[in-house]
Amino acid sequence: MFTLKKPLLLIVLLGIISLSLCEQERAADEDEGTKIKRRIFSKIGGKAIKNLILKGIKNIGKEVGMDVIRTGIDVAGCKIKGEC
């Protein structure tokens, strides 16, 4: 019985080592895949997001500028008329 335990133990240990190595390789492959996805999305998505933000800032700047001008004209008109 003792002679059967050694080969069985050896097979189990080799199986565990093999499984561990496969899991490490699988994890490395998944990491590479996510890096590639990140690069693709950062190139495509980064430009799109950047353009959206810039357009939004420009539109907000225009609206704020127009509001300031309107307010300034209203205040100036009020002071000229003496109604303030």
Curated annotation (Swiss-Prot):
One of its GO terms (cellular component) is extracellular region. It comes from the Eukaryota. Expressed by the skin glands. InterPro entries: Antimicrobial_frog_2, Frog_antimicrobial_propeptide. The keyword Disulfide bond applies. Residues 1-22 form the signal peptide. Residues 23-36 form a propeptide. It is found in: Secreted. Keywords: Amphibian defense peptide, Antibiotic, Antimicrobial, Cleavage on pair of basic residues, Disulfide bond, Fungicide, Secreted, Signal. It holds the Pfam family FSAP_sig_propep. The keyword Signal applies. Belongs to the frog skin active peptide (FSAP) family. Esculentin subfamily. Has antimicrobial activity against Gram-negative bacterium E.coli ATCC 8739 (MIC=3.1 ug), against Gram positive bacteria S.aureus ATCC 6538 (MIC=3.1 ug), methicillin-resistant S.aureus ATCC 43300 (MIC=12.5 ug), B.subtilis ATCC 6633 (MIC=12.5 ug) and against fungus C.albicans ATCC 90028 (MIC=50 ug). This is Esculentin-1ISb. The lineage of its organism: Eukaryota, Metazoa, Chordata, Craniata, Vertebrata.
